[in-house]
């Protein structure tokens, strides 16, 4: 698994997913923990509280990612050393929203090749100072992240990590039946509390709405191989003849 090479330990919180996450974890990361969620409905506040309670058990650098999110850096040791050198306890790692270019001719992924090597179209969420940056995922060594709902923001002081490292969020990619079904399975599990407070309501979508969303996001997707920072992370994709 992608993250076994980056982190010493991993905990998969199983929320009854039907995307084979548990089976895949047992196969490729048998030393990782699998914990069944105690939150029966998808409630953004309660889910994040559960995550933070687990974080309290862990020391060192911690990062909470969804199964569709992949932390990517060029060199693991240089990355974690830089977190210490920069002197902060929390960093926002910039996110790239992966969105298939419908004209590119992508085929279904092959399981023997890392997904991050099979897709290279997306949109980088750029920080826009002085506006707060809500587009990243947080890595920290606090007792817990004190996250706001959604885990993109925290009252803890943090800085945006402006070096070649990204979270690749497979947003509308791979845009195939499996991904569509995955998106559709979340909405029915939303709690009334979340819906009432407008938390996670983007998951309340029909297939037609998803297709329209996808078309909308394709207008801003780009070939990441032309991005200089992405080239540092994936030189084999960007310069295949070198």
Residue ranges and their predicted role:
Residues 8-16, 37:
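Short beta-strand/loop segment that forms part of the nucleotide-sugar
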Residues 2, 15-21:
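Ser/Thr-glycine-rich phosphate-binding loops at phosphate-binding pockets of nucleotides
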Residues 1-8:
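Short, well-formed alpha-helical segments that are part of the catalytic scaffolds
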Residues 44-52, 72-242:
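Catalytic-site signature of metal-activated, phosphate-bearing donor transferases
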């Amino acid at each position: 698994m992608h993250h076994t090479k980056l982190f010493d330990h991993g905990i998969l919180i199983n929320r009854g997913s039907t995307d084979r996450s548990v089976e895949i974890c047992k196969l490729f990361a048998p030393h990782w923990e699998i914990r069944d969620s105690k939150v029966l409905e998808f409630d953004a506040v309660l889910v994040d509280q559960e995550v933070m309670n687990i974080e309290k058990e862990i020391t060192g650098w911690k990062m909470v990612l969804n199964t569709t999110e992949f932390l990517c850096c060029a060199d693991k040791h240089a990355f974690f050393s830089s977190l210490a050198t920069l002197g902060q306890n929390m960093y926002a790692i910039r996110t790239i929203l992966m969105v298939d270019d419908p004209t590119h001719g992508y085929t279904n992924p092959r399981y023997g090749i890392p997904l991050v090597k099979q897709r290279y179209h997306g949109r980088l969420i750029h920080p826009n100072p002085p506006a707060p940056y809500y587009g990243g995922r947080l890595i920290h060594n606090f007792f817990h992240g004190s996250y706001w709902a959604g885990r993109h923001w925290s009252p803890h002081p943090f800085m945006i990590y402006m070096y070649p490292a990204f979270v690749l969020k497979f947003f509308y990619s791979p845009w195939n039946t499996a991904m569509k079904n995955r998106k559709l399975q979340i909405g029915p599990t939303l709690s009334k509390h979340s819906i009432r407070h407008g938390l996670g309501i983007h998951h309340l979508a029909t297939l037609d709405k998803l297709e329209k969303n996808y078309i909308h996001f394709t207008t801003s997707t780009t070939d990441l191989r032309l991005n200089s920072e992405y080239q540092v992370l994936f030189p084999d994709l960007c310069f295949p003849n070198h």
